[in-house]
Amino acid sequence: MKITVQNKNAELAFDCGATESILYAGLRQGINLPFECATGTCGTCRARVMSGEVDVRWKEAPGGARLKPEKGDILMCQTRARSDCVLRVPSKLLILEKSRPARRQGTIRGLRRLTKDVAHFDLHLSAPMTFEAGQFVVLEAEGIPGGRAYSMVNFDTDVDKLALVLKRKPGGRFSDWMFDELKNEMGVEVFGPLGRAVFRPEEARNVVCIAGGSGIAGMMSILERAVRADHFRNHRGAVFFGVRTLADAFYLAQLSRYTEASHGNLEVTLALSDEVAATPLHAEFTALKLESGMVHEVAARVLAARERDFLTYIAGPPVMVDSTVRSLIAGGTVIRDIRYDKFG
């Protein structure tokens, strides 16, 4: 099928297969369609069907709460075309210049628990992938409706294995499926890479990373990229990792290694929302600082007296992301220096 997308100033067209979402079809062909989560959660990929027939796969998607289906509103990530279609979108239409996302097969291996409700796993790919630090992929499993977005923990080019973090969520069918049976050697569909909240050393900026829970995954990729590029030789960095209690924190050894490789220019603070920090430093990983409070509040306190000369990356639950953005802007950070991909 042919899909034509329009806004007030431009029109672009692309082909769409019968079994793929309109969003994925456009992205893999280099059309920069609007999206954030790509899984039905955020609502950013909304469009209006002006002509043609479509099939909405997940009518109850949270991101569709404000749509007007009677006027033809859809989420492109949850919609397949049944004929040639014309869609109206509210954002600019551009051709992607960087690597385009594609569909691959993946095999889950090395699944291991990090905490009571967080696990790490490796995803072995059927074809190599090149991605930027901070990007994510969407996984789909047979028999489980919809896709789930996961940020890469690792960083490299032309890789055939991704490191990912899984957070168990109440009522989450995919996370329950993974946790209950520890699905090693299981196959999944993979679409990516996706995401615009990326780190590029050539921008030559100081960096702040603020993450809640499993949101630390993408920050680990950013830190890996920065350390490999020796970014912290000439630039400062600060990481704020929010968890409920110290027992909920993970990747601490790796975070400690990043501080050791930073020429003294990277600081890492664990923000404990449900526990009083007994000491100012972690007992085992003494390079890591401890603070009590919500992660966005801890970050605001620490950054209050600092010059706003940094790029800030945010990842975590949508409520946490929204609170952090408001806090940063109130503290004087300009919106163009805040980067995040909102999914959760």
Residue ranges, per PLM feature:
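Ferredoxin-reductase
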Residues: 100-187, 205, 243-245, 271-275
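Short, surface-exposed secondary-structure boundary micro-motifs
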Residues: 50-53, 92, 142, 193
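A short, basic/flexible loop-to-alpha-helix module at the beginning of a structural domain
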Residues: 192-203
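Histidine-anchored nucleotide/phosphate-binding helix
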Residues: 220-230
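Short, conserved phosphate/pyrophosphate- and ester-handling motifs at nucleotide-, phospho-/glycolipid
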Residues: 134, 215, 317
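Reductase modules of NAD(P)H-dependent flavoproteins
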Residues: 1-79, 85, 237-344
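Short, structured interface segments
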Residues: 74-97, 186
